[in-house]
């Protein structure tokens, strides 16, 4: 009787383990399928703008509106007071950007009264805006309000989020605004900048791959040396001094 009971117990245990194992396998497969389905369903959202300088001297400006429509315009010459209009991927946080000469920043700056250091925005414009406004670095119109102080961003704007070029444009704009008041904005390269520019897109949102596919180009081409953001990025430092402090990613 005891051996029969033991046999039944072993049988039930084996059956239960097999059932749990099959459930876990099915759950794993189901999770992978859902992830693939999510990637397939991801669509274009508000993005850009991307400014590309053509070999014939024309300027191509690419935007995506919040409905996912690609607006691709080529100019023989840019209109006077040409302005880029930027929003996040949902059409929020609107600000304008005017192109300005790109200069390589210095690597050694004097100590400012205040230095605000941030890192790894990873495509989250909403978080960047909240952080900068909460610390009185920008005002309600997203303009520089940090006076003669120094904003330091230690890399990694690319990947994970859906507002990558928008964050680049914000710092591009603030850099010029800060300089006019005696302040400084320093954006340094992290590890994700060279990764993406080398076409390593492991952590890049699917929407960017979809955009590149629709434009019939590789994604890094939108930040190449013949683009405005690409020219700005290629001048960024990988390490920098402020006073006696060394900053690296």
What is the predicted role of each segment?
Residues 26-248:
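Feature recognizes metal-dependent phosphohydrolase scaffolds
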Residues 1-30:
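Bacterial Sec-dependent N-terminal signal peptides
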């Amino acid at each position: 009787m005891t051996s029969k009971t033991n046999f039944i117990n072993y049988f039930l245990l084996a059956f239960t383990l097999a059932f749990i194992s099959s459930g876990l396998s099915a759950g794993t497969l189901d999770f992978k399928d859902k992830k693939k389905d999510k990637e397939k369903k991801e669509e274009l959202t508000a993005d850009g703008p991307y400014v590309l300088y053509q070999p014939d001297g024309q300027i191509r400006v690419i935007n995506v509106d919040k409905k996912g429509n690609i607006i691709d315009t080529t100019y023989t010459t840019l209109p006077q007071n040409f302005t880029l209009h930027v929003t996040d991927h949902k059409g929020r946080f609107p600000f304008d950007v005017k192109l300005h000469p790109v200069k390589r920043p210095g690597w050694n700056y004097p100590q400012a009264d205040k230095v605000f250091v941030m890192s790894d925005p990873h495509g989250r414009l909403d978080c960047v805006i909240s952080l900068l406004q909460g610390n009185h670095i920008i005002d309600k119109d997203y303009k520089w309000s940090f006076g003669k102080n120094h904003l330091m961003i230690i890399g990694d704007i690319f990947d994970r989020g859906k507002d990558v070029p928008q964050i680049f444009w914000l710092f591009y704009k603030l850099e010029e605004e800060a300089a006019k008041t005696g302040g400084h904005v320093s954006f340094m390269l992290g590890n994700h900048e060279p990764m993406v520019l080398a076409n390593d897109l492991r952590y890049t949102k699917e929407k960017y791959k979809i955009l590149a596919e629709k434009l019939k180009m590789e994604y890094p081409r939108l930040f190449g040396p013949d683009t405005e953001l690409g020219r700005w990025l290629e001048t960024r430092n990988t390490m920098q001094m402020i006073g006696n402090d060394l900053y690296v990613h």
